[in-house]
Swiss-Prot record:
BP GO terms, sorted: DNA-templated transcription
Binding site residues for Zn(2+) 1: C60, C62, C75, C78
Protein name: DNA-directed RNA polymerase subunit beta'
Organism from which the protein derives: Lysinibacillus sphaericus (strain C3-41)
Required cofactor names: Mg(2+); Zn(2+)
Single GO molecular function: DNA binding
Length: 1227
C-alpha cells in the first residue's frame, strides 16, 4: 500500500486505451455474474475470480490450493491467484469494445468539449454519434467541406457522383478520426490570430475554443481519448451482489448497466463476424453507444434506463454526486469505531472538565484497553479469557475500568455541530444508569437542553490524539466563543436567578444595620436567622483580606449585604470586592462611597441618649448601638444597588479570564454555578397565576385607541385619506396602545414579583412575554405576512375569545414552519461558507504588506452599528498611534491592540485607526499572523496553522438560525420591504442583485435635474465634467439626493441596497470590501448577534480574490479567463522580467458558491457541487491538486495541513542527551 502521507499532489487526466488495459487484470467477456446453483462467480463474467481475485482469503476457485502457504500461486486448473480476498476491492477488468463509443461527459457536458475542439455544434455531434447523419472526414477532390453533415439520402447521392474520392462516415468512429486529424499547435496559432481581429460572439467562441485547445496542449491529453475503445470495469467489491434472507439477491445497479453493455457488445461482434447489413450493424452500434452512456451517466441524454418499479438506475456519475455520493458520504464523513450515543441528563455536581459516562457504555468503549490491563495485572491469562471476563462483567473489570479511564479524555458531540464548540473533550467519570451526564455550563456552547437531547461519545485512541483532546479541546479550555471573543460559558436560567436573588438589596430587611467583624460572623448570623440574605449590613473591611483595599479603607467599615459577602467568596483572591454591577467596580476598585467610619456625631448621640433603652446598655453595647445608628443614616444616603444580572455575570467571567486565564476561570465558574443552584433553590421562586396582575386602567387605554381608530375610519369613508394611510394609522394606533400598556405594566410591577425577577435577571422571559400574559397580545400577522388590523385585546391571564385564538394560530404556525425552513437554509449557508474558506489557514508570521485598512466606527446614517473600540481590539496597528494632543505614543507600529489600548485610543478622541487586515494580506493560500491579529477563542495571538477560514465560516453560519426568515410586509409605503435576516445574508454572500436595489451614480458631478416622468417614476440627471448621465429611479423609490447636490462616483441616489457588482465597476475593491462588511454586520447587529469583523473579512476576501484577464499582452494568459490575483501578478512579473508586454485585468466579485467552484483544487470543488462538470473540466486540463486545503486532504486520507497536521509541526524530533533533554526542530 502507498502511504497517503507521502503524497505531494494528485493529478487527474483522460485515460488512454493503453492505460485502461494496463490497469486491467483481464477481459470481461460474458454478462454472467454468479452461478445460481453453486453461488460461485462465473468464469469470464462480471465477478470472475480469475480476473478480480479469490472470493475467500487464500483459496482458489476450484479448491485445489487452500491456506496461506500457497500465497502467490496461480492455480493450474482454474487460473485463480491465491491471495487475500480484499484485492477484489482494487483489481479492475476491461471490456474490448467492438466499435468506438464517445464518452458522454465530454460530448454532452456544457459547454461540449468535443464540440468546441472540433468547432461543431453539439446538435451536429449528436446526429453523427447516434447514427442519424454522416460527417465528411476528408473531402478529397470534391466540392464538399470537411465536417459537413450529410443525410443518408445526400450521402448516397454523393457516393454515386464522386465514388470513393471522399471519406464520410457516422458514429463515434467518425468523430475519432476527426479528432485524430487535429494539430493542436496549428489550432492554437490560428485561434490566437483570430482573437486579434474577432469581435462579439465570434470572439467569445474563439476564447472558449482556445481554452479547450490549450488545455489539451498543455496537459498532454490526446483529444482522441475522449472516444473509448476499451471500457474499464470497476472492481466487483465496489458493485457488490449480496444474498438476502429469502434466497434472493440484491445487486448494485452498475452490474445491470455493465450487463447491458456486454450483451450489446457481444451481439455487435457476432453481427460483424456474420457480415450483417450495415443498417443492422449501425443500429447495434447506436445501442452500444447508449448502453455506455447509461453506464457512465444515466439520464444525461434521453430517458434514463430504469430498473424494477420504474426507478432510474444509479450510474457511475451518480455514485459520486450529492449527499449520498462517494465524496460526501464516504470520503468527507465516515462512521467511526469506538463511539456510542445516549440521552443526556444534567450533572450539576461535575467539574467543568468532567462528564458522566454510563458504566455499560464505558466498558464497551474502552474494551481493548481494559483487556490489555487485565492481562498485564495477571487477572487474566490471555486476551481471550480477558474478553470473557468483560462479557461476564466480572468484579475485577470495574476496578480496572476505573484506572483505564482516569486521565483518558473522551469527546462529546451534539448534532447539529454548528461551530467548533459542538464537539469538546471531557474526563469521564463512571455513573450508574444509561444516560450521559453533562455539565450545565457547557450547554450554551452545545445549544443542548435536557428534554431528550442525545449526544455521541468518541474515544481518542493514540497518545497524540489524547494529548490534543486534553490540551486543545477540553471543555475548561473553551471558555470564549470564537465568533466574538466573549465568554460562552455564562450561567443561565437557575444559576442566573440564584445569583440575582443572592445579590438583591432590600430596605429595612431583618437585622438591617447590624455590624460584623468578619465574614464568618455574617454566615453564622445568616444561618441562625438574625439577618436575611438581602439585609444591608456593615463589615470590617480589613477582615475581608482584599488586596485592592487601601490601608485606610481596611480600618473602615464596608456597606454591603449578606448575599454579597457570600457572592464575593467565589471570586479570585486579588479581585476587587464587587458591591455594585458597574464596570468601574469590576475592573478597578470598590467605589469609595461604600466605605464609612462609624464615628458618631453630636446630634445623633443626643437622640440616642434621650432613649432609656440605650442608657441601660453596658459600654460595648452602647458603642454598637451608636454605630448602628450612624449606619442607618448612611444607608439613607446610599441608594439601593441593583442586583447582578446575567450580563454582569458574563462581564465578571470575562474579567476573570482576562486576568487569570483558564484554570482560575473554570474553577470560579464552577463555584458560581454551585452558588446559583443553591440560592435559586433557597429562593423558592415559582410562578403562579396570582403573580400575573392585570392592569386596572387597561380598558381606558383600549377605549382611547378604539376612538382614534373610529375617527380614522370616518375620515377614510369621507375620502379624506387613502386606503394605505388608513391602514397605517390603524396599525400605529393599536401599536401605541400596546406600548402604553407595556410601559404602565412595567411600572406597576413590584420588584419582588417572581415573573419580574426572572425576566429582570435575564434568566427567562422578557417584557413582551409579560405584556402578553398580563396586558394584551397585540397585533398579529396573517399567513401572507401582512398585519391584521384587528388586535387581540385580551391577555392570556384573562383568556382569548374564539376569534382571537384563531387569529393567533396564523403566527404560531408560521413560526414553526419558518423555524424548520430556516434551519435547512442556515445549514446550507454554513456549508457554502466552509467550502469557500476551507483553505484559508494562517500560513506565516508576516506577509510584509505595505497596505492597511483605515477604520472608524461602523455607522448607518446616524445609527451606530459597531463602535470603534469593538472593531480594533485584537488587531495589529499598521501605523504608530499617537495621542493627538499630548503627542505621546499610545502604541507602536505592528503592536497588538488589547482592551486597555483600545480604551486609551477612545479616550484620546481618536476616531480612525489604520490596522492590518485580512483584506490587505499578501499571503498566498491563507493569511498571516499580523494581518489576522488575535485568536478570539483564546485571547492570544493567533498561531501559525490555525484554520481561520473554517472558524470564520462557523462564526457566520452558526448564528444564522437566530436570524429572521422573511421580511414582514407592513404594507403602506414602498421601501419598507428591504430584505433582512437570513435571505439578506445569502444575497450578500452570493453577490446577487439585491431586492430593492438602489441606483448609484457612475460619474462624479452635480444633480442638475429631477423630473417626474409618470406618477411614482422619477428621472435623475447628473451633470459631470465630461458627460451627463440620466438615471431612472425604481417605481415609488425614495430619493437620497435633491437638485443641486454634489455626488461622487458610486454614491447612492435612491434608498435600498447597492449591487456589489455595480459598485465594483465604478469604485475600487476596498470600497466593495468595506460595503460588504458593513452590510453583513448590519444584519447581525440588528438581531443582537455580535460577530468579529475579521471573520467577515476572511469570507469577503475569498469572494474578491479573482481577476478577469482583459488583454493578454505577451503572457500565456487567455483573455476572458478567471485567475487568482497571485497567479496574475506572477505571470505579469515574469513577462516584465523578459521585457514583454504585461496583461491587463479587472477585479471580479464571485458569490461564495461560484468562488468554491472556481477554487484551484478540483477535489474540493468536485465534493462541493456540480461534481461531473468539475471533474470533466479538471480531466481535460490535466489538473494537479496541490492538496493545500483541508477538504482535499480529508478526501485522500492525509492529515489536514492545519494545526498539528502542518508540516512544520510534524517534522519535530526530540533528541535525548545524557544530561538534559532539548527539543530540536528538524526544519
Amino acid at each position: 500500500m502507498i502511504d497517503v502521507n507521502e503524497f505531494e499532489y494528485m493529478k487527474i487526466g483522460l485515460a488512454s486505451p493503453d492505460k485502461i488495459r494496463s490497469w486491467s487484470y483481464g477481459e470481461v467477456k460474458k454478462p454472467e455474474t454468479i452461478n445460481y446453483r453453486t453461488l460461485k462467480p462465473e468464469k469470464d463474467g462480471l465477478f470472475c475470480e480469475r480476473i478480480f481475485g479469490p472470493t475467500k482469503d487464500w483459496e482458489c476457485h476450484c479448491g485445489k490450493y487452500k491456506r496461506v502457504r500457497y500465497k502467490g500461486v496461480v492455480c493450474d486448473r482454474c487460473g485463480v491467484e491465491v491471495t487475500r480476498a480484499k484485492v477484489r476491492r482494487e483489481r479492475m477488468g476491461h471490456i474490448e469494445l467492438a466499435a468506438p463509443v464517445s464518452h458522454i461527459w465530454y460530448f454532452k457536458g456544457i459547454p461540449s468539449r468535443m464540440g468546441l475542439i472540433l468547432d461543431m455544434s453539439p446538435r451536429a455531434l449528436e446526429e453523427v454519434i447516434y447514427f442519424a447523419s454522416y460527417v465528411v472526414i476528408d473531402a478529397g477532390a470534391t466540392n464538399l467541406e470537411s465536417k459537413q453533415l450529410l443525410s443518408e439520402k445526400e450521402y448516397r447521392a454523393y457516393r454515386e457522383k464522386f465514388g470513393n474520392t471522399f471519406e464520410a462516415s457516422m458514429g463515434a468512429e467518425a468523430i475519432k478520426k476527426l479528432l485524430g486529424k487535429i494539430d493542436l499547435e496549428d489550432e492554437t496559432h490560428s485561434l490566437k490570430e483570430e482573437l486579434k481581429s474577432a469581435q462579439g460572439q465570434r470572439r467569445t467562441r474563439a476564447i472558449k475554443r482556445l481554452e479547450v485547445v490549450e488545455s489539451f496542449r498543455n496537459s498532454g491529453n490526446s483529444p482522441e481519448w475522449m472516444i473509448l475503445d476499451v471500457l474499464p470495469v470497476i472492481p466487483p467489491e465496489l458493485r457488490p451482489m449480496v444474498q438476502l434472507d429469502g434466497g434472493r439477491f440484491a445487486t448494485s445497479d452498475l452490474n445491470d448497466l455493465y450487463r447491458r453493455v456486454i450483451n450489446r457488445n457481444n451481439r455487435l461482434k457476432r453481427l460483424l463476424d456474420l457480415g450483417a447489413p450495415s443498417i443492422i450493424v449501425q443500429n447495434e452500434k447506436r445501442m452500444l453507444q447508449e448502453a455506455v452512456d447509461a453506464l457512465i451517466d444515466n439520464g444525461r441524454r434521453g430517458r434514463p434506463v430504469t430498473g424494477p418499479g420504474n426507478r432510474p438506475l444509479k450510474s457511475l456519475s451518480h455514485m459520486l454526486k450529492g449527499k449520498q455520493g462517494r465524496f460526501r458520504q464516504n470520503l468527507l464523513g465516515k462512521r467511526v469505531d469506538y463511539s456510542g450515543r445516549s440521552v443526556i441528563v444534567v450533572g450539576p455536581n461535575l467539574k467543568m472538565y468532567q462528564c458522566g459516562l454510563p458504566k455499560e457504555m464505558a466498558i464497551e468503549l474502552f474494551k481493548p484497553f481494559v483487556m490489555k490491563e487485565l492481562v498485564e495485572r495477571g487477572l487474566a491469562h490471555n486476551i481471550k479469557s480477558a474478553k470473557r471476563k468483560i462479557e461476564r462483567l466480572n468484579n475485577d473489570v470495574w476496578d480496572v475500568l476505573e484506572d483505564v479511564i482516569r486521565e483518558h479524555p473522551v469527546l462529546l458531540n451534539r448534532a447539529p455541530t454548528l461551530h467548533r464548540l459542538g464537539i469538546q473533550a471531557f474526563e469521564p467519570t463512571l455513573v450508574e444508569g444509561r444516560a450521559i451526564r453533562l455539565h450545565p455550563l457547557v450547554c450554551t456552547a452545545y445549544n443542548a437542553d435536557f428534554d431528550g437531547d442525545q449526544m455521541a461519545v468518541h474515544v481518542p485512541l493514540s497518545a497524540e490524539a489524547q494529548a490534543e483532546a486534553r490540551l486543545l479541546m477540553l471543555a475548561a479550555q473553551n471558555i470564549l466563543n470564537p465568533k466574538d471573543g466573549k465568554p460562552v460559558v455564562t450561567p443561565s436560567q437557575d444559576m442566573v436567578l440564584g445569583n440575582y436573588y443572592l445579590t438583591l438589596e432590600r430596605e429595612s430587611a431583618r437585622g438591617e444595620g447590624t455590624i460584623f467583624y468578619g465574614p464568618n460572623e455574617v454566615l453564622i448570623a445568616y444561618d441562625t436567622g438574625h439577618v436575611h440574605l438581602h439585609t444591608r449590613i456593615a463589615i470590617k473591611a480589613g477582615s475581608l483580606n482584599n488586596p485592592t483595599f487601601t490601608e485606610e479603607q481596611n480600618n473602615m467599615f464596608l456597606l454591603t449585604t449578606v448575599g454579597k459577602v457570600i457572592f464575593n467568596e467565589i471570586l479570585p483572591e486579588s479581585f476587587p470586592y464587587i458591591n455594585e454591577p458597574t464596570d468601574f467596580n469590576l475592573e478597578q476598585v470598590t467605589p469609595e462611597k461604600y466605605f464609612v467610619n462609624l464615628t458618631i456625631d453630636e446630634e445623633t448621640l443626643k437622640e440616642l441618649e434621650s432613649d432609656s433603652a440605650y442608657n441601660s446598655l453596658d459600654e460595648k453595647g452602647k458603642i454598637d448601638a451608636q454605630r448602628t445608628a450612624v449606619l442607618r443614616k448612611h444607608f439613607e444616603s446610599v441608594p439601593v444597588v441593583n442586583p447582578f444580572r446575567k450580563k454582569f455575570l458574563g462581564n465578571i467571567i470575562a474579567e476573570v479570564f482576562k486576568r487569570f486565564h483558564i484554570t482560575e476561570t473554570s474553577k470560579m465558574l464552577d463555584r458560581m454555578k454551585n452558588l446559583g443552584f443553591k440560592y435559586s433553590t433557597r429562593a423558592g421562586i415559582t410562578v403562579g397565576v396570582s403573580d400575573i396582575v392585570v392592569l386596572p386602567d387597561k380598558g381606558e387605554i383600549l377605549a382611547v385607541a378604539q376612538e382614534k381608530v373610529d375617527k380614522v375610519q370616518a375620515q377614510f369613508r369621507r375620502g379624506f385619506i387613502t386606503e394605505d394611510e388608513r391602514y397605517d394609522r390603524v396599525i400605529s394606533s393599536w401599536s401605541a396602545a400596546k406600548d402604553e400598556i407595556q410601559a404602565k405594566l412595567m411600572k406597576s410591577l413590584e420588584k419582588t414579583n417572581p415573573i419580574f425577577m426572572m425576566s429582570d435577571s435575564g434568566a427567562r422571559g422578557n417584557a413582551s412575554n409579560f405584556t402578553q400574559l398580563a396586558g394584551m397580545r397585540g397585533l398579529m400577522a396573517n399567513p401572507a405576512g401582512r398585519i391584521i388590523e384587528l388586535p387581540i385585546k385580551s391577555s392570556f391571564r384573562e383568556g382569548l375569545t374564539v376569534l382571537e385564538y384563531f387569529i393567533s394560530t396564523h403566527g404560531a404556525r408560521k413560526g414553526l414552519a419558518d423555524t424548520a425552513l430556516k434551519t435547512a437554509d442556515s445549514g446550507y449557508l454554513t456549508r457554502r461558507l466552509v467550502d469557500v474558506a476551507q483553505d484559508v489557514i494562517v500560513r506565516e508570521d508576516d506577509c510584509g504588506t505595505d497596505r492597511g485598512l483605515t477604520i472608524g466606527a461602523l455607522m448607518e446614517g446616524t445609527e451606530l452599528i459597531e463602535a470603534l473600540d469593538e472593531r480594533i481590539v485584537g488587531r495589529h496597528t499598521k501605523k504608530t498611534i499617537v495621542h493627538p494632543e499630548t503627542g505621546e505614543v499610545i502604541l507602536n507600529k505592528d503592536g497588538l491592540i488589547d482592551q486597555d489600548v483600545a480604551r486609551a485610543i477612545i479616550e484620546a478622541g481618536i476616531e480612525e485607526v489604520t490596522i492590518r487586515s485580512a483584506f490587505t494580506c499578501n499571503t498566498k493560500h491563507g493569511v498571516c499572523k499580523k494581518c489576522y491579529g488575535m485568536n478570539l477563542a483564546t485571547g492570544e495571538k493567533v498561531e501559525v496553522g490555525e484554520a481561520v477560514g473554517i472558524i470564520a465560516a462557523q462564526s457566520i453560519g452558526e448564528p444564522g438560525t437566530q436570524l429572521t426568515m422573511r421580511t414582514f410586509h407592513t404594507g403602506g409605503v414602498a421601501g419598507d420591504d428591504i430584505t433582512q435576516g437570513l435571505p439578506r445574508i445569502q444575497e450578500i454572500f452570493e453577490a446577487r442583485n439585491p431586492k430593492g436595489q438602489s441606483v448609484i451614480s457612475e460619474i462624479a458631478g452635480t444633480v442638475s435635474d429631477i423630473t417626474e416622468i409618470r406618477e411614482g417614476l422619477k428621472e435623475i440627471t447628473i451633470q459631470g465634467d465630461v458627460e451627463t448621465r440620466k438615471y431612472q429611479a425604481p417605481y415609488n423609490a425614495r430619493l437620497k439626493v435633491i437638485e443641486g447636490d454634489n455626488v461622487e462616483r458610486g454614491q447612492v441616489l435612491t434608498e435600498g441596497s447597492i449591487d456589489p457588482k455595480q459598485l465594483l465597476k465604478v469604485k475600487d475593491v476596498s470600497t466593495v470590501q468595506e460595503y460588504l462588511l458593513k452590510e453583513v454586520q448590519k444584519v447581525y447587529r440588528m438581531q443582537g448577534v455580535e460577530i468579529g469583523d475579521k471573520h467577515i473579512e476572511v469570507m469577503v476576501r475569498q469572494m474578491l480574490r479573482k481577476v478577469r484577464v482583459i488583454e493578454a499582452g505577451d503572457t500565456d494568459l487567455l483573455p476572458g479567463s478567471l485567475l487568482d490575483i497571485h497567479q496574475f501578478a506572477e505571470a505579469n512579473a515574469d513577462a516584465v522580467m523578459d521585457g514583454k508586454n504585461p496583461a491587463t485585468c479587472r477585479p471580479v466579485i464571485l458569490g461564495i458558491t461560484k468562488a468554491s467552484l472556481e477554487t484551484e483544487s478540483f477535489l474540493s470543488a468536485a465534493s462541493f457541487q456540480e461534481t461531473t462538470r468539475v471533474l470533466t473540466d479538471a480531466a481535460i486540463k490535466g489538473k494537479r491538486d496541490e492538496l493545500l486545503g483541508l477538504k482535499e486532504n480529508v478526501i485522500i486520507g492525509k492529515l489536514v495541513p492545519a494545526g498539528t497536521g502542518m508540516q512544520r509541526y510534524r517534522q519535530i524530533r526530540i533528541e535525548k542527551d545524557e544530561l538534559d533533554t532539548e527539543v530540536v526542530s528538524a526544519e
